[in-house]
Amino acid sequence: MSHSDLRLTDFRRIVIKVGSSLLIDSAAGKVKSAWLAALADDIAALHRAGKDVLVVSSGSIALGRSRLKLPSGTLKLEESQAAAAVGQIALARIWAKVLDHHGIGAGQILVTLRDTEERRRYLNARSTISKLLEWRAVPVINENDTVATSEIRYGDNDRLAARVATMTSSDLLILLSDIDGLYTAPPGINPNAKLIPVVESVTADIEAMAGAAGSELSRGGMRTKIEAAKIATSAGTHMLIASGKIDHPLQAIIDGGPCTWFLTPANPVTARKRWIAGSLEPKGVLVIDAGAVKALDAGRSLLAAGVTRIEGTFARGDAVVVRGPDGHEIGRGLVAYSADNAERIKGKSSAAASKILGLTGRPEMIHRDDLVVSHHHDNGHNNGSHGVSTPAPEPSA
């Protein structure tokens, strides 16, 4: 794939990361309102074109520091957490206001490292974000600095943005930066430094080009952006770094402005399913009936109605093996219910399952995006199979 083949408007689900130094005027201690309004114009244009847009926004600690009139310098952990508590309110209000100008709702999501590393919490966070996107809102995501400690934090929003992109099967991650891409050397030091327009894969040479640049307002430099690229591209998400120091930075990318693309050979769904199939140890087994086998072969989700037996002890979000009535493995997936709850609702319709559990959560035992079908049957057409859920369109590059 060449640089000319890459068009921002071809992507369906886009995560945009905005750093503190772009959003906050450190001298005045205020948000750069005109710049943010221009960025919101760009986001609204993508939204009108039918794109799913997510924002990962830094700035809560910087805003809190300003609102509390704290002196410059490094903050202790508890000081950062207290500043974030004040700043998170301000940050949410700011994003809600600029997006509301375009008739777009904003939803605040505060996450910690464990929300994307532990599968149960991962599923909860992902389902919340998915519902916001379904309602055509823009999720505004930040690390929950009020509760994150040094041991369980990302420490930068570049890697958080990459995790969000992979969690939501986004096909593009945009890191808006104070530099317009990856250079062969630090451009502020070496006048001969050249912008690299496309990175096919993150090699040791590419990593060596990443300087350690950072600022008091921002915890991340180019090194964390390269780490983000490794996370994103390994999960099937393309990434680009572009300058956010101009008005309408997304439109500038569309118009062919300078940036660096990091390419992935896979799409998000393929990469995610490879991870489920090969990297996770199954904790249990779901045995399903013939109708559900047909449903899975047709690309549907697995509903409780099609499950006949539960084996093993597992929690929500654990990997399980799916077997057909003859005992052969049909596939593997991330189960949406614990073994106890799965046992209670097996063979039941979605309405009955919801009544038994006293909730109206996901009707699927395993969602199709969390399921890898490894053995296909010659089932012809799916006529009246139970255990069936109509598939939703998958994001694709």
UniProtKB/Swiss-Prot annotation:
State the superkingdom. Answer: Bacteria
Q: What Gene Ontology terms for biological process does this UniProt record contain? A: L-proline biosynthetic process
What keywords appear on the UniProt entry? Answer: Amino-acid biosynthesis, ATP-binding, Cytoplasm, Kinase, Nucleotide-binding, Proline biosynthesis, Transferase
Q: Where found, per UniProt? A: Cytoplasm
UniProt-annotated stretches for the region Disordered:
374-397
Assigned EC number: 2.7.2.11
Q: GO cellular-component terms in the record? A: cytosol
Q: Which residues bind substrate?
A: S58, D145, N157
Q: Tell me one GO molecular function of this protein.
A: glutamate 5-kinase activity
List, for all copies, the residue spans of the domain called PUA: 283-360
Q: Cite the binding residues for ATP.
A: K17, S177, D178
Q: What is its main location?
A: cytoplasm
Record's catalysed reaction(s) = L-glutamate + ATP = L-glutamyl 5-phosphate + ADP
Q: What does this protein do?
A: Catalyzes the transfer of a phosphate group to glutamate to form L-glutamate 5-phosphate.
Give the protein family: Belongs to the glutamate 5-kinase family.
Q: Which NCBIfam families match?
A: proB
Which PANTHER family does this entry report, sorted A to Z? GLUTAMATE 5-KINASE, ISOPENTENYL PHOSPHATE KINASE
Q: What is this protein called?
A: Glutamate 5-kinase
According to its UniProt entry, this protein's organism is Afipia carboxidovorans (strain ATCC 49405 / DSM 1227 / KCTC 32145 / OM5) (Oligotropha carboxidovorans)
Identify the coding gene: proB
